[in-house]
Amino acid sequence: ISFGACSANNAAAETEASQQTPEATSTPDVTVELDTSEDKGAGKSNAGSMSVDEQRYASVLDLYYQALYAHQAGTADWDRDKYVVERGLAECIVNPYWAWENSDGLLSRIGYSFRDLNGDGTNELLLGWIGGDFCPMEDGYAFAVYIINGQPLLAFQGQERDRFLIGDDGYVYRSGSSGAAYSEYEKYRFHPEWQYCLEPVELFYSQIDEDNHFWWEHVVGAEQIMGLQRLERHEEYVVDSDFAMETGKIWTSSGVNLRPSNFLVYAAKRG
């Protein structure tokens, strides 16, 4: 499975990558292969009970199942680096913060679903958390999104403080924070020709200067967002703080229920 799915057809993409917030997670450029050394309960194809999308993404779903199985069991097979660094899996899926001390039920609390994010007739694979009060898939949150381009490819992934939500209006929204004074809300179109498959549409972000003056800025348009120098104050972009935060609240409340299946269900289908 290769990672590094989406690219930009313009030079500004590199500018965007260099100006991400500290929490933003880039896509690792590595190649990994399915570990078939041990039977972890999934991997033997039972295609008759699997959907077309589950068959299409089976290679990456198998890898996530293996990682989650090992983590939940607490076996010697569980090694964060083995799955996150060597195989390039999304850390918030195989190693969520709420499982650090108690991984019981991990296979039932991590889920996946399929959704056509750009209307091209092919569904993407979305992975995230099931249930709970913090960023569940039922509220539209996804911590990893894969596309198909001959094989499954990781488009983008989130973190606990850099979260992606699939809006009911077809947009992808990101909410991020690197402290009380630095927050962002960003609106994207899902577009495979852009870096991380995300075309910037609209951005709200907060800043604070050395004199503790705090403000929000609002930027519209991919060219303007990607060329932005975020450590500077731009008077033309400054907006009312209440307006910025209220808009961010509306965006992050617009998630569509992704109706996830968990990995126990996946294992049963795989046989």
Task: Pin down the residues of each PLM region.
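Acidic, small-residue rich beta-repeat scaffolds with periodic aromatic anchors
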Residues: 33-82, 169-271
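Beta-propeller blade repeat segments, especially FG-GAP/WD-type strand-to-loop junctions
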Residues: 138-156, 188-190
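C-terminal motif of bacterial Sec signal peptides marking the signal peptidase cleavage site
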Residues: 4-5
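Ser/Thr-rich, Proline-interspersed low-complexity disordered segments
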Residues: 13-33
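Beta-propeller blade termini
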Residues: 108-117, 161-171
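Beta-propeller fold detector
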Residues: 154-159, 198-202
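Acidic/hydrophobic-patterned starts of short beta strands in beta-sheet-rich repeat architectures
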Residues: 118-129, 170-173
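Short glycine/acidic-enriched loop and turn motifs that connect beta-strands
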Residues: 131-135, 179-180
